[in-house]
Regions:
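A short SAM/SAH-binding and catalytic strip from SAM-dependent methyltransferases
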Residues: 139-152
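A short acidic, Gly/Pro-enriched loop at the edge of an enzyme's catalytic core
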Residues: 128, 132-140
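Class I (Rossmann-like) S-adenosyl-L-methionine-dependent methyltransferase catalytic domain
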Residues: 2-74, 79-131, 149, 153-156, ...
């Protein structure tokens, strides 16, 4: 006979899954998906970097290579796979996850050309509903996903994504800072907007302790600002034990 504790846990898990499904299929996220789909269908250069890995992520690859032998890496929202290929080349078993098929096909082609296909697994799925078992990865890289997630959906993201890390695993996050501009002279009166049908969130340094401090140890925060680009690159580590969750609400 199942215990009341089991039933409560099962009910809570089912409720969280239902919320994640509803969030992933919200009108805003459907429009956002449509925006990225159209960019790939256009067939030209993307508005974001798509070939060379970002220096901050290269640093993390070097760090992981020194500390973990034969580790597993998840590139969340991998796009055309510039970081997926980086970690595979460094010798790691790497999973590239994206919710669009078009960029995954590009990764597959690049992996074959670089003779890295045996180290790479590609999955189609949403960050809020990743089709992966918990406690799987030594490192999770999110370059440019979290800043497209509404604040109301952060708890779903944290549950889904951080749960994929092994205890003691590393989490590298790259997101827009408030210095990011879509175009010269852009003015904003709030820390989020909807631009060309996709949601963008802009962060300041103190945000990361508030959002992630209840679940991760923050190891380093690097700010990058060049031209219109403004980013924070944050390296965190999931503790071996359980930390308190951070309560968040709002937009």
């Amino acid at each position: 006979m199942r215990s009341a504790r089991y039933e409560a846990q099962h009910s809570r898990a089912a409720s969280e899954t239902s919320k994640a499904i509803a969030a992933a299929n919200s009108p805003l996220y459907r429009r956002q998906r449509g925006y990225f789909t159209r960019v790939y269908e256009a067939g030209g250069p993307t508005p974001w970097p798509s070939t060379e890995p970002t220096p901050s992520v290269v640093k993390v690859a070097r760090l992981l290579k020194r500390r973990v032998r034969g580790g597993r890496v998840l590139d969340l929202g991998c796009g055309e796979g510039r970081h997926t290929l980086l970690f595979a080349k460094a010798g790691f078993s790497t999973v590239g996850l994206d919710y669009l098929l078009a960029p995954l096909k590009m990764v597959a082609t690049r992996a074959r050309q670089a003779r890295l296909a045996r180290r790479i697994r590609l999955l189609i799925g949403d960050a809020l509903l990743p089709p992966i078992k918990p406690d799987t990865f030594d490192l999770l890289v999110d370059y440019g996903c979290f800043h497209h997630v509404k604040k109301a959906d952060w708890p779903n993201y944290l549950d889904a994504v951080l749960g994929l890390l092994k205890p003691g695993g590393y989490f590298h996050l790259s997101v827009f800072s408030t210095k990011f501009k879509h175009y010269p002279g852009e003015r904003r009166t709030r820390n989020w907007n909807v631009h060309r049908n996709h949601y963008d969130r802009f962060f300041v340094k103190r945000d990361f302790a508030r959002i992630f401090g209840g679940r991760c140890e923050i190891l380093a925060i690097e700010e990058e600002h060049k031209g219109l680009d403004g980013f924070f690159h944050v390296l965190m580590r999931k503790p071996s034990g359980m930390l308190l969750r951070t309560d968040m609400g709002g937009r």
